[in-house]
Regions:
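Flexible "arm" and connector segments at domain edges
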Residues: 1-97, 101-135
């Protein structure tokens, strides 16, 4: 199976991260930066609710009828997000997700793991397990 342009872009991204990561190359720094960047993603989503208001969160217990099949469940479960991100919030969240991906790629580089291979293996596991791989 040949690699698509998206596969090549992912590997190229990991190579660029390797070239650019200078100051925080220690695995301890990388792990810390992953945690900080994930917090920034969460904070950006929260700000889109609390400061901008373009989206809201309608969090409540979700009902799972006993007679529902596995295929029915995907239609019954809600994201609990109402509305759509405005362009400014979307841009901010995308930027923060990019930062999180940067440090995830840095962790892969530090441990000599291919991010492409990780994603490919996860995709194959999901395809193999199907509904038995609920997350």
């Amino acid at each position: 199976m040949g690699k698509s342009i998206n596969d090549i872009l992912l590997e190229d991204f990991q190579n660029v991260v390797s070239e650019l990561l200078i100051r925080n190359r220690s695995i301890l720094d990388v792990l810390s930066k992953i945690q900080v960047s994930e917090g920034r993603v969460n904070r950006a989503v929260v700000k889109s609710v609390t400061h901008c208001g373009c989206i809201s969160i309608d969090g409540k217990k979700q009902a799972f009828p006993n007679e529902a099949s596995m295929s029915d469940l995907s239609g019954l479960v809600s994201t609990q997000v109402k509305g759509e991100l405005c362009p400014e919030c979307r841009q901010t969240i995308e930027k923060e997700i990019g930062g999180a991906l940067f440090y995830l790629a840095a962790l892969c580089n530090t441990l000599d793991i291919s991010l492409y291979d990780v994603i490919l293996k996860e995709k194959e596991a999901l395809a193999t397990l199907g509904n038995y791989c609920l997350r």
